[in-house]
Design a protein with these regions (language model features):
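Surface-exposed loop and membrane-interface regions of Gram-negative outer-membrane beta-barrel proteins
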Residues: 178-180, 198-237, 254-259, 263-264, ...
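Signature for the C-terminal beta-barrel architecture of outer-membrane proteins
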Residues: 252, 272-457, 473-480, 485, ...
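Bacterial N-terminal signal peptides
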Residues: 32-42
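Asparagine/serine/threonine-enriched low-complexity, disordered tracts
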Residues: 2-23
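Short loop/turn motifs that connect adjacent beta-strands in outer-membrane beta-barrel proteins
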Residues: 76-78, 100-114, 129, 133-146, ...
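N-terminal periplasmic/intermembrane-space "pro-region" immediately following the signal or transit peptide
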Residues: 47-176
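Outer-membrane beta-barrel "beta-signal"
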Residues: 318, 371, 520, 558-572
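Extracellular loop and loop/strand-boundary signature of outer-membrane beta-barrel proteins
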Residues: 170-174, 216-221, 258-263, 302-304, ...
Length: 572
């Protein structure tokens, strides 16, 4: 018996020593990588402070399309937002390639030329500062630069079968609310020298039900009482290639278009501190040939009315561009803290990173991780018949730690293809995207895994909205969208969406949606848009509680929603 006890003690000691050695090895690797990254950031050259483009800005889709067409060939476009100067750098690549006769006249110019012309007007001051084009002396290129964007939207929404509101995907916590209403926001920005930038964006909504800060049914609907609020307010400071940003804002981490698994602008904007590289950089020494890198991180505070008031979220993302046609990303979110939790930053995050999953007490946390990619595939006879080839992208995520390779035990995924030009010399594109957070339930039988947590019962959410994909847990989403320029300044788009939410419940929601929208550029600084969306919902759901997060589905109800909207945006 004593021998058995001695053997067990010896085995436990060996296991402890092995774990300590493993942790020491991890620390050495992490320390070595951190030293290289810090050196790269400090000696990567000076990045000029610049305000971020808002996530809904048309320039993102234009730059992505030029990248998919191969006109821009060295861009990191997955992590958003990025700055105006970063966007101008990508536009400059296209201009320089055209000047160097590196772009063949093969039909891509039908869409590339009007897009590039519009981008050159939008980022003219930045292009002048980069020496790409000459200025007239009247542009705002001095040490004090400023601008503004005003957008006003008039909506007429008719939500059927007594469902007074319906969540609006990727709109910062907003709803479709019955009736006619107006939404107007003013976004002003200021850049000071090469070291500071400020953004202020207040917003007015005439119907307080269109912005939800709580459940949409039940007694807590009294929380939804805002007519005006600060949508974004931030200060960014830059030194060398390091950017520190403090304030309120939104981010989109992932290549998905209709959604992304971990971080989108579906929920209300986060109050946060961001730290990262202002532009892509190379590692020093022999590692330079590995390609370009970019690092983003943030520490955010969630809302007050939840399981643990003002719980924290720490996010870390590493983007890697090993070749001009391939972009890879690694993301990790850690939820911790809040009133009464007794946890602190950064100690809790470090413990969560190094410890096995399902810890207790002060080391307990809620985690998500994701690997994603975007790849451009050239035209290949008989296989890829499209004139400019196509782009494929995907995301593979894990709820909690990535416990097994290659597919985690609590997986979700997103996959898509984007064809920037369907026919030679034409302007029509096509996107097909599929997302699935129901994979784990179908595989293991466990329900409600994604965006939920046993300790943090409000989940990885803000005001009941997932920080990631709008469809939520145990859901599938099929999205198809195609756009075509009727003229250089008039774009027609049509989309289709089929979505099933909360498939693990006896009664779950099914949505069939089709929409059409038209955008006209009156000038490079002014655009007018109008659209119509038809929705047919079976068993529509409404949020009834935040702690724990609860959604109720109206069994046997089929609702038809008619959604009209029009907007005008002007930049100064």
């Amino acid at each position: 018996m004593n021998q058995m006890n001695q053997i067990n003690k010896t085995n436990q000691t060996n296991k402890t020593n092995q774990m300590n050695q493993t942790n020491q090895t991890r620390i050495l690797w992490i320390g070595g990588i951190a030293v290289m990254v810090v050196a790269a950031l400090l000696f990567a050259g000076v990045a000029q402070a610049s305000v971020n483009l808002p996530l809904q800005h048309w320039a993102y889709s234009a730059i992505e399309r030029l990248t998919a067409l191969g006109i821009i060939d060295d861009a990191m476009v997955v992590t958003k937002p990025y700055s105006r100067k970063e966007a101008a750098k990508y536009v400059a690549q296209a201009i320089e390639r055209v000047r160097a006769d590196q772009i063949s006249i093969d039909g891509r110019e039908a869409i590339a030329e009007p897009l590039l012309a519009r981008l050159m007007v939008e980022f003219r001051p930045e292009l002048i500062m980069q020496g790409v084009i000459e200025g007239s002396g009247k542009e705002r290129t001095g040490s004090l630069r400023y601008g503004a964007r005003v957008q006003s939207e008039v909506d007429a929404f008719f939500v059927g079968e007594g469902q007074t509101v319906r969540f609006r995907e990727n709109r910062g916590g907003e709803y479709y609310a019955n009736g006619v209403q107006n939404q107007t926001d003013v976004r002003g920005w200021l850049e000071v020298g090469d070291w500071a930038s400020v953004v202020v964006q207040p917003k007015f909504i005439s119907n307080r039900n269109a912005l939800s800060e709580g459940p949409t049914i039940g007694p807590l609907t009294s929380l939804n009482d805002q007519y005006a609020y600060m949508r974004e307010l931030s200060l960014k400071l830059s030194f060398r290639n390091v950017a520190l940003e403090v304030g309120r804002g939104t981010q989109w981490w992932g290549p998905g278009y209709h959604g992304s698994l971990l971080l989108t602008n579906h929920a209300f904007p986060l109050d946060m501190i961001k730290l990262g590289s202002d532009k892509a950089f190379y590692l020093p020494w022999v590692f330079r040939d590995l390609g370009k890198w970019k690092i983003n991180s943030f520490l955010a505070q969630l809302e007050d009315e939840r399981d643990y008031s003002h719980a924290k979220i720490f996010g870390l993302r590493v983007n890697y561009l090993p070749a001009s046609w391939l972009e890879i990303g690694l993301t990790r979110l850690t939820q911790f803290g809040g009133q009464g939790r007794g946890q602190s930053f950064p100690r809790t995050v470090v413990d969560c990173y190094k410890n096995p999953p399902n810890q207790t007490a002060s080391q307990d946390c809620n985690e998500q991780s994701m690997i994603d990619f975007r790849a451009r595939i050239p035209r290949t006879p008989y296989l890829i018949p499209f004139p400019a080839g196509m782009q494929i992208y995907g995301e593979l995520g894990s709820e909690d730690k990535w416990s097994q390779i290659p597919i985690p035990s609590r997986a979700a995924f997103l996959a898509g293809i984007y064809i920037p030009q369907l026919f030679k010399g034409d302007t029509q594109d096509l996107r097909i995207e599929y997302a699935d957070t129901d994979y784990t339930r179908r595989k293991t039988g466990f329900t409600g895994v994604w965006y939920n947590n046993g300790q943090f019962t409000s989940g990885m959410r803000q005001n009941g909205f997932p920080l990631g994909h709008a469809m939520g847990t145990d859901a599938i989403d099929i999205y198809i969208r195609s756009t075509r320029y009727l003229t250089d300044n008039l774009q027609l788009a049509h989309s289709f969406n089929h979505q099933e939410r909360a498939r693990g419940l006896p009664v779950h929601e099914k949505k069939f949606e089709t929409s059409v929208d038209l955008t006209y550029w009156v000038s490079a600084r002014m655009q007018v848009s109008l659209g119509y969306t038809y929705q047919r919902l079976k068993n529509p759901g409404q949020i009834s509680d935040l702690t724990p997060y609860t959604e109720q589905f109206a069994s046997g109800v089929t609702a038809t929603n008619q959604l009209f909207w029009t907007s005008v945006a002007m930049e100064f």
